[in-house]
């Protein structure tokens, strides 16, 4: 069975805003909220920049569930609840087994791991807290979304570093296409702003000291953030039967592996994923008006991605709009491409392409139209790139229904 899959609700929170509407407002207007991290103890990393959620919005998650949740699970449940509310859906005994969830994340519960190490190694505590294992496991976000919303269909976590959000959405689309579910909540969540994670990224020598400047000649690296982005996916038939508002269609999926290096990017893997996505969506290269780039702000990644885009799109690469919204919401790892899904859906809805913020100097190696600093009004079909360490690549295509 091969069914069309549409998006009927979105939800999210990150340092730009605590719901999808406020995130999109900031993306559309183009400011960057990246600043020194203040809500966690950084010790020797004091002054490191990032994009943090300074206050969690109000929610009605019961305390009994909260005590077993890491921060990344909390963000996932809040975003998923918003998406379900916009979609106008709820679970009951009749439909729960046809509703599922696929949650992408970059790693385990970083907060839980750091808290445990500190309490035992520094504070002299002899035992870990009772919920340490279930709080920290990567699949916890999917489980908590399922528990809170009553989803009893396919429920699982997807861990593929920076491509996890797109991989989760792709996997959820497959569940619907194959008839295993009618509705899937899908996206990504991550809360990596802990001392241990930042220290690990510092060791890679890719953290920017000031801000994220994708494709700009003076770019200096990645800035990390935290957040979650979620979409309610439905079969077209299911959404139409209940008169739902369809925000966009997931038109195509492209997946690939580099089989090259654990950290260095290759051109061939991303190229293959983009070509596969176009083929799955039955699109020609010139059908794509907007490409939300992976665009991390590192020298190597941005040059590689530019070269791969040129290979796939040819002359059209110079005519379409490209931007990296990581310049605004930072790199939220497992949540990154899920937040970028929100950008693509809203770009289709409003006919506005979000800019690449913080852009200052053209780079001859990154010579595409990267929509520098100012949003652009343009009706568009869109694609979203996600290329992760380890060479795991996931590309999605979206179009108006």
From Swiss-Prot:
Listed GO CC annotations: plasma membrane
Residues annotated as transmembrane: 329-348
Enzyme class: transferase
Pfam families recorded: ketoacyl-synt (PF00109), Ketoacyl-synt_C (PF02801)
UniProt keywords, alphabetically: Cell inner membrane, Cell membrane, Membrane, Nodulation, Plasmid, Transferase, Transmembrane, Transmembrane helix
Superkingdom of the organism of origin: Bacteria
Biological process terms in GO annotation: fatty acid biosynthetic process
Main location: membrane
Active site (UniProt): 162 (for beta-ketoacyl synthase activity), 294 (for beta-ketoacyl synthase activity), 331 (for beta-ketoacyl synthase activity)
GO molecular function (one): 3-oxoacyl-[acyl-carrier-protein] synthase activity
Enzyme nomenclature, EC number: 2.3.1.-
Entries under InterPro entries matching the protein: Beta-ketoacyl_synthase, Ketoacyl_synth_AS, Ketoacyl_synth_C, Ketoacyl_synth_N, PKS_Beta-ketoAc_synthase_dom, Thiolase-like
Classification via CDD domains: KAS_I_II (cd00834)
Residues in Ketosynthase family 3 (KS3) domain copies: 2-400
Subcellular location: Cell inner membrane
Keyword presence, Transmembrane: yes
Task performed by this protein: Proposed to synthesize NOD factor fatty acyl chain. Involved in the synthesis of a highly unsaturated fatty acid moiety, which forms part of a lipo-oligosaccharide that is responsible for host specificity.
The family this protein is said to belong to: Belongs to the thiolase-like superfamily. Beta-ketoacyl-ACP synthases family.
NCBIfam families listed in its UniProt record: PRK07314.1 (NF005589)
Name of the protein in its database record: Nodulation protein E
Gene that encodes the chain: nodE
